[in-house]
Each structure stands twice: as structure tokens, then as C-alpha cells.
Amino acid sequence: MNLTDYVKEVSRQDFGIEFQHTASWNSRLQTTGGRFFPEDGHLDFNPKFCKKGDAGTFRKIVRHELCHYHLYYAGKGYRHGDKDFKDLLLQVNGVRYAPSIQSNTFYHYYQCESCGQVYQRKRRMNTKKYACGNCHGKLRHQNQS
């Protein structure tokens, strides 16, 4: 079953209303579970929440975005702060906020040879070009995690 069919099924079962547009994956989403676009009515979802393995959480995220969708087309308040949105979200048991995702970010660690200050960086840096910010000592690349 593709994503649009799944969203249509959730809309039919939980709202009793048909979903008329498309749903797609958007891997550029970082902290949000999904987005609703009022301009053309399509929904974007973060694939990280589906890959996490918790189908119940992803279904709640779909309900959240469908609340935006159905309220917008009903001419009611569809934004997060609107009472109509909060009431419908509570009624269908959707999530208010997307749960945090454990990131598997790779870090490089650098330690000053003089003062022992440790620096954590996401990107590797040239230790010949940079020095310690405290004592201007030489930096040494540590084991990465």
C-alpha cells in the first residue's frame, strides 16, 4: 500500500471523510512529523517516523495532518492554536507534537594538548589550521563516535 492510499484509509476510518489529494514522503523534514500545504492540499510526511517501527505513532501523525486538511476545507480554524483544531485532534486521538527521533549523528572530538579542552564537531576540521579557543594550543583529533 502506498502512502496516499494509507492516508485515504486513515481518513475514511478515523474521520469518515474522503481524502482527495496526494500524500508524499519528504526526507528534508528534520523535526516535524508532517506538513499540510493549503495552496494545493497535499500532505508531506517525514519517513524517519515510519522507519522507526512504531506504526501507532505514525498513524497519530497522519491524523494530526488530516485535522489540518479537513478543517481547512471545512472553512474552520485549522492552525495549531485554533480551538477547532485542538478539539478535533483530541477527538481522533492525534499527537499534538511529533516525538523526538534519536539521531545517529557522527561526531568528531578534538582535544587541546596544552589545557585538555575537548571540542565536539559534526564536521572534520584541519588541526593544522585551527587552535584551541582557550589557550591557543595545538588540537589533536580523538576517536570519533
UniProtKB/Swiss-Prot annotation:
Source taxon at top rank: Bacteria
Required co-factors: Zn(2+)
Residue positions binding Zn(2+): 64, 68
Stored Pfam families: SprT-like (PF10263)
Keywords recorded for this protein, A-Z: Cytoplasm, Metal-binding, Zinc
Subcellular location: Cytoplasm
Domain SprT-like: 4-141
Residue runs in coiled coils: none
Annotated Gene Ontology cellular component terms: cytoplasm
UniProt family annotation: Belongs to the SprT family.
UniProt xrefs under InterPro entries: SprT-like_domain, Uncharacterised_SprT-like
Cofactor binding note of this UniProt entry: Binds 1 zinc ion.
Subcellular location, principal: cytoplasm
GO molecular function: zinc ion binding
Descriptive protein name: Protein SprT-like
Any one biological process term the GO annotation gives: response to stress
Active site: 65
